[in-house]
From Swiss-Prot:
[4Fe-4S] cluster 2 binds at C245, C248, C262. Binds 2 [4Fe-4S] clusters. Binds 1 [4Fe-4S] cluster coordinated with 3 cysteines and an exchangeable S-adenosyl-L-methionine and 1 [4Fe-4S] cluster coordinated with 3 cysteines and the GTP-derived substrate. Residues 4-222 form the Radical SAM core domain. S-adenosyl-L-methionine binds at G64, S114. This is Probable GTP 3',8-cyclase. Its EC number is 4.1.99.22. GTP binds at R13, K60, T90, K151, R250, I251, R252. Keywords: 4Fe-4S, GTP-binding, Iron, Iron-sulfur, Lyase, Metal-binding, Molybdenum cofactor biosynthesis, Nucleotide-binding, S-adenosyl-L-methionine. It comes from Saccharolobus solfataricus (strain ATCC 35092 / DSM 1617 / JCM 11322 / P2). The keyword Iron-sulfur applies. Pathway: Cofactor biosynthesis; molybdopterin biosynthesis. Belongs to the radical SAM superfamily. MoaA family. The lineage of its organism: Archaea, Thermoproteota, Thermoprotei, Sulfolobales, Sulfolobaceae.
Length: 308
């Protein structure tokens, strides 16, 4: 499906929970501000089933922290049974050492792991948890079981910017495939923490100097730098960036049952909770959800647009 701005809809992001065992001060919560209402596994898979009918072939599980869902493995297995070619997840890695193998067997294809520091002290200051070593073990487990590409997310801010350069070195030593250096943006808790925002220009200039090739990612048109080691460094600057929005191919299912068409907005959402919890047959629910998707696609628009 193509929206009225010519952007294809290819990716479904599902927030499994708002609960998290970390307390990162800038968490964007997938742009959601509603209650932590947990959709059932059946609800999630029904929405995902309808999304497949619209040509969506990629799904990412997010949170909060998705590994806190006890039915996570079953959800992953169900998504693969629906025919999704690409099932991925973003996690803080705390529980990954014990879950990586089970998730791989269930069909998880790849994984993003958040690691916003390279030292225990900075890690604890950012997350509120002394778990740096445990997350490193989770990363190693993901690599060992073949959840590739393993990507690490590093949100750059004033509290950790000096570690961004060392983060590149650590990532190469760990053997991960790719890292994302992400600009802090004012969504979720990031609204309150935006004073900690730090410009990525100096870091990107350094990466460009040491890289052997520069690429542009089709999704969001992000710059990607290939280092001599083979590590790919992607620079993510979404805020006030029309280029980022022009390449957006996502729709989100929020934790409280809304189809969310934009990370930055709460006014253009379609509430499907009543459909999911209503006393309808599954066929009727699918039909109603299909209509909801059509409306969501119709109202979808870039938050940041080029000024003409």
């Amino acid at each position: 499906m193509i929206d009225r701005f010519g952007r294809p809809l290819e990716d479904l992001r599902i927030t499994l929970t708002h609960a998290c065992n970390f307390e990162c001060f800038f968490c964007h919560m997938e742009g959601e501000e509603g209650d932590n209402y947990l959709l059932s596994k059946e609800d999630i898979l029904l929405v995902a089933k309808v999304a497949r009918k619209f040509g969506i072939n990629s799904v990412k599980l997010t949170g909060g922290e998705p590994t806190l869902r006890r039915d996570l493995v079953e959800i992953v297995r169900g998504l693969k049974q629906l025919g999704y070619e690409d099932v991925s997840m973003t996690t803080n890695g705390f529980l990954l050492k014990d879950l990586a193998h089970k998730l791989k067997l269930a069909g998880l294809d790849r994984i993003n792991i958040s690691l916003h520091a390279v030292s225990r002290d900075t890690f604890k200051k950012i997350t509120g948890v002394d778990a740096f070593d445990r997350v490193i073990e989770g990363i190693k487990s993901a690599i060992d079981v073949g959840l590739v590409p393993v990507k690490l997310n590093f949100v750059v801010n004033r509290r950790n910017r000096e570690e961004a350069f060392k983060f590149i070195e650590l990532s190469q030593n760990l053997g991960v495939n790719e890292i994302h250096l992400i600009e802090l943006h004012p969504v979720g808790l990031g609204k309150l923490a935006f004073k900690e925002h730090d410009d990525l220009r100096e870091i990107e200039e350094y990466i460009e100097k040491i890289s052997i090739k520069k690429l542009i990612r089709k999704k969001h048109f992000r710059p990607r730098y290939v280092l001599p080691s083979g590590l790919i460094v992607e620079v993510v600057k979404p805020y006030a960036n029309p280029i980022f929005c022009a390449g957006c191919n996502r729709i989100r299912l929020s934790v409280d049952g809304k189809l969310k068409t934009c990370l930055y907005r709460e006014d253009n959402v379609i509430d499907v909770l009543d459909i999911l919890k209503g006393e309808y047959s599954e066929d009727v629910k699918e039909e109603l959800l299909g209509r909801a998707f059509m409306i969501a696609i119709a109202i979808r628009e870039p938050n940041f647009k080029y000024k003409i």
